Amino acid sequence: MLVVPARLHRWPPEVQDLFGREGPLVLEIGFGDGRFTAELARSRPDWLVLGAEVSAASVLRALRRMRREGLANVRLYHGQGPFALRNLVLPGTLDQVIVNFPDPWPKKRHQERRLLREAFFRRLSTRLKSGGSLLLTTDHEGYFRFALEEAERTGLYRVEVRPPPEAHLRTKYALKWKEAGRTFFHAAFIKLREDPAPWPPLRRYDVAHALLSGELPQDLALEKTAVRLKEGVAVFLEVARGKEGFYVLTHVEEEDLTQDLLLEVRKSARGVYAGVSRFGSPLITEAVKGAVRALVDRLEAHGLEVVQDHT
């Protein structure tokens, strides 16, 4: 029920890979505690519901809810919605996207963090089927008007402003704000045409490591070291010494994806191994390979020499 990108056999996956069957595909971005997700899955058992949520606590609560209710047509992803849209949905296969009460980022200097911007609508058009739609429900009029303008700027959608469906007002926060007498806004953004710019998925790699000759250094002074990468940034947070070498807790940020993973430097039968630990099922991307490359550079500065490079 929980989608872990690194464990998927096919990349990007097909609907059959995720759900074990075909059916109308719906993506909910920001499902919170999952009560709307569960209601949707119950009311439309023929639909296949993929949810994306950044809060780990919310994902856990929603996962428990789905299991408790035995909802086999739901899959949950812990991470950002645009990542799921880009990498877990094939082009032209998505029937609907649902966004209920997104973070409005009300301050002007934060508006670039809003989800429903022109670039998102353009990319969304590559994943929606012809006639597919995005449904937005919000209590923030400024955000609502902003989203309408951003979608209109693309020329790719027909926008229909409608009363919000009752089911969309039964989320955790909607119920709270309904009692407070707030006004709600709802619109359907229906795809008319597709943006010509391709939006390929992230490239996933099987390995990211190097073998080096030489002796392990006595220490690695890497704590809280940030490294700029072509694809983002890596931060070496902590270094722990073990019997065989070092473990480096590393934070990697790239577009729509943040990972905390372990890199390891240890003795092996063929020399010194430096690479990604499989602990936690990290997704090996260009940025992760860049983090390993930065670690290897530090080892080279200690006098080790690369004899095999898969970074």
Curated annotation (Swiss-Prot):
Single GO molecular function: tRNA (guanine(46)-N7)-methyltransferase activity
Keywords: Methyltransferase, S-adenosyl-L-methionine, Transferase, tRNA processing
Family the entry assigns: Belongs to the class I-like SAM-binding methyltransferase superfamily. TrmB family.
CDD domains: AdoMet_MTases
Record-linked Pfam families: Methyltransf_4
Pathway where this protein functions: tRNA modification; N(7)-methylguanine-tRNA biosynthesis
Name of this chain's protein: tRNA (guanine-N(7)-)-methyltransferase
InterPro entries in the record: SAM-dependent_MTases_sf, tRNA_(Gua-N-7)_MeTrfase_Trmb, tRNA_methyltr_TrmB_bact
